[in-house]
Curated annotation (Swiss-Prot):
The keyword Cell inner membrane applies. The lineage of its organism: Bacteria, Pseudomonadati, Pseudomonadota, Gammaproteobacteria, Enterobacterales. This is High-affinity choline transport protein. The chain crosses the membrane at residues 15-35, 54-74, 94-114, 144-164, 196-216, 233-253, 265-285, 319-339, 350-370, 412-432, 452-472, 477-497. It is a multi-pass membrane protein. High-affinity uptake of choline driven by a proton-motive force. GO terms for molecular function: choline transmembrane transporter activity; transmembrane transporter activity. It comes from the Bacteria. NCBIfam families: bcct, PRK09928.1. PROSITE patterns: BCCT. It catalyses: choline(in) + H(+)(in) = choline(out) + H(+)(out). One of its GO terms (cellular component) is plasma membrane. Keywords: Cell inner membrane, Cell membrane, Membrane, Stress response, Transmembrane, Transmembrane helix, Transport.
Length: 677
């Protein structure tokens, strides 16, 4: 079924969203570069205010996000598809799982997989450091910050974007999820504000990741090639990301970028296996099991632990508040990616896959590298601990230096980090371009020049933050800039829930019997005629004749009668899509602010079953004339129907639609408005 909201217009920017967000970000970037001391002071004071005023809110919000996602997946809404009912997943289960697996990998994992466990072990938020309990607590906090809570934010945004875009053909933007609440007002200031908040939050999240990546890579290159660990080298790495994005746009190597992303998975797994078998394998496997048990046992208590009576303010700002804001900032970016690869899957499949598969990888990575780092410290690595705390970007390489073949492993780590870095920068520019564009359909991407612009903007912002106060500035601004979008996510939750409730009314209306009708002569087919219909496998010519002489006249009669009764009706015979031989018929009845009635007839091509005589005679395919409503295929075949029977089917579906509208209007809080079909 085609996108009913498809526009023939050329892709163009959304001027309000683009100029506002671009202006604010460029102004902020230049301010941090030109007025470093002032920027550092302002960021510090703002962070203190946000932490004191909204620290509790970040903890509560993160908890509500994961509760909402799990409840939706486990409820009856879990069977709703991200797309029309007849849609099938674009990717096999294995390919989809591999892409989810890759989504769990990033250069920040290399940075924090050693730095956080070591810091939490040496300076825990509560209790004494450098104890067995501190070691267990250190790994649980690390897993907690990279765990299910964060992935639930990605799942929430991906679920909302996929549902509204692929099921209701709305643009693949954040404002689409707010349509059930604000209706057509999302095309005005409300929608613009939401998209601006998404763009600003996303670019700061990406800049934080790239800033961490720049610092990490600069040190790796200095270890391998004696390249100075300097701001000039960091600026060169930032320039590299801009160049890669430009090449990706101008030479069409997007597919190559995706191949590099897949290569990252293999290299990352190789690093895990290297450390696992070069280290104390038995200890690491035992520690992995212990970490899982501790994570499960302590998860609920940690989720809402605000340390109210003895609050470690600096620790909260640097860790839990930073991570939750970081996940929030990245949620539009990753949510968009997850939505694009998950069309045709049910909400339950999507949520389970998104929560379990990527976290499985992060669990393995963090457990192997984190426990290896703690093992080194416990067995006399005091100098290693000090270096990992004071210079966290060195921790990962310092750990690899404890094993044989350091040059080789450090080279693999640097290549892996570099690939993560350039692919994240390129993908980030693409997503920001899409969020600031008016795309003609949900499968379109932003113009190339816009992607280059956002790549430059990301680079400037990253450079400005690093020049102001290094990684600390990036972390602090993420906590600040992630706050507005965290409020937007609650509106997304409300819009998604209200729209899913509509699915209940639709199902109930479909289950209600339509008015009984007497069987006519055409209904009482002889058994021979019925058998002939069942054994018929029509080709292109017969199907086209059926559409022109029976289906279209039937739809035209219904349309004329509805117009006589005051309805605004559109009837179209649309040309074949690319690669198809037959077009389709489209009947649209406008219903004001209620959901429009859509009735389409599509010729669907299938392979002839092998047990039939036709298959043995050489005919390989046949057509079914299937009916489609807005929510998808109805699964029936109109082939060999009479005109009266087609009219009856249209009226049956129209009556069900009116029942659905009646049920929806009777429901409490039925303010959900619908997009034009």
């Amino acid at each position: 079924m085609t996108d009913l909201s498809h526009s023939r217009e050329k892709d163009k920017i959304n001027p309000v969203v683009f100029y506002t967000s671009a202006g604010l970000i460029l102004l902020f970037s230049l301010t941090t570069i030109l007025f470093r001391d002032f920027s550092a002071l302002w960021i510090g004071r703002t962070l203190d205010w946000v932490s004191k005023t909204f620290g509790w809110y970040y903890l509560l919000a993160a908890t509500l996000y994961i509760v909402f996602v799990v409840c939706i997946a486990c409820s009856r809404f879990g069977s709703v598809k991200l797309g029309p009912e007849q849609s099938k997943p674009e990717f096999s289960l294995l390919s989809w799982a591999a892409m989810l697996f890759a989504a769990g990998i990033g250069i920040d994992l290399m940075f924090f997989s050693v730095a956080e466990p070591v810091t939490q072990y040496m300076q825990p938020p509560e209790g004494a450091g450098q104890t067995i309990e501190a070691a267990r607590q250190a790994m649980v906090w690390t897993l907690f910050h990279y765990g299910l809570t964060g992935w639930s934010m990605y799942a929430l945004m991906g679920m909302a974007l996929g549902y509204f875009s692929y099921r209701y053909n709305l643009p693949l933007t954040i404002r689409s999820a707010l349509y059930p609440i604000f209706g057509k007002r999302i095309n005005g200031p409300i929608g613009h504000s939401v998209d601006i908040a998404a763009v600003i939050g996303t670019i700061f999240g990406i800049a934080t990741t790239l800033g961490i990546g720049v610092v990490q890579l600069n040190y790796g290159l200095s270890v391998l090639f004696d390249i100075p660990d300097s701001m000039a080298a960091k600026a060169a790495l930032i320039a590299l990301s801009v160049i890669i994005a430009t090449i990706s746009v101008t030479s069409g190597v997007d597919k190559g970028i995706r191949v590099l992303s897949e290569l990252n998975v293999a290299l990352a797994l190789g690093l895990i296996l290297f450390v696992l078998f070069m280290g104390d394998t038995s200890f690491l496997l035992n520690a992995l099991v212990l970490n899982v048990g501790d994570y499960v046992n302590r998860f609920m208590g940690m989720t809402l632990n605000s340390f109210a009576f003895d609050r470690p303010v600096e620790w909260m700002n640097n860790w839990t508040l930073f991570f939750w804001a970081w996940w929030v900032a990245w949620s539009p970016f990753v949510g968009l990616f997850l939505a694009r690869i998950s069309r045709g899957r049910t909400i339950r499949q999507f949520v389970l896959g998104t929560l379990i598969i990527p976290f499985t990888f992060t669990l393995l990575w963090l457990s192997v590298f984190g426990n290896s780092a703690l093992y080194e410290i416990i067995h006399g690595g005091a100098a290693f601990a000090e270096e990992a705390m004071v210079h966290p970007e060195r921790g990962f390489y310092s750990l690899l230096a404890q094993y044989p073949a350091f040059t080789f492993s450090a080279s693999v780590a640097t290549i892996t980090g570099l690939l993560f870095y350039v692919t994240s920068a390129d993908s980030g520019a693409l997503v920001l371009g899409n969020f600031t564009s008016q795309l003609k359909d949900i499968n379109s991407d932003a113009p190339g020049w816009l992607r280059v612009f956002w790549s430059v903007a990301i680079g400037l912002l990253t450079l400005g933050m690093l020049m102001t106060n290094g990684i600390s500035a990036l972390q602090n601004t993420t906590v600040i800039m992630g706050l507005p979008f965290s409020f937007v996510i609650f509106f997304v939750m409300a819009g998604l829930y209200k729209s899913l409730k509509v699915e209940d009314y639709r199902r109930e209306s479909a289950n209600r019997d339509t008015a009984p009708r007497p069987l006519g002569l055409q209904d009482r087919l002889s058994w021979k005629k019925r058998l002939s219909r069942l054994m018929n496998y029509p080709g292109t010519r017969y199907t086209k004749q059926m559409m022109e002489t029976v289906c279209y006249p039937a739809m035209e009669e219904v349309a004329q009668e509805l117009r006589l009764r005051g309805a605004y009706v559109e009837l179209k015979s649309l040309p074949p899509e690319e690669g198809q031989q037959l077009g389709h018929l489209d009947l649209l009845v406008h219903m004001g602010e209620e959901q429009n009635f859509v009735y389409q007839i599509w010729p669907q091509q299938y392979s002839v079953p092998g047990f039939t005589y036709r298959a043995r005679s050489g005919k390989s395919t046949y057509y079914r004339l299937e009916t489609f409503l807005l929510e998808g295929s109805q699964g029936n075949d109109l082939m060999d129907y009479s005109k009266e029977q087609v009219i009856t089917d249209i009226l049956d579906q129209y009556e069900r639609h009116l029942n659905f509208i009646h049920l929806h209007r009777e429901a409490p809080g039925h303010s959900v408005m619908f997009p034009d079909a």
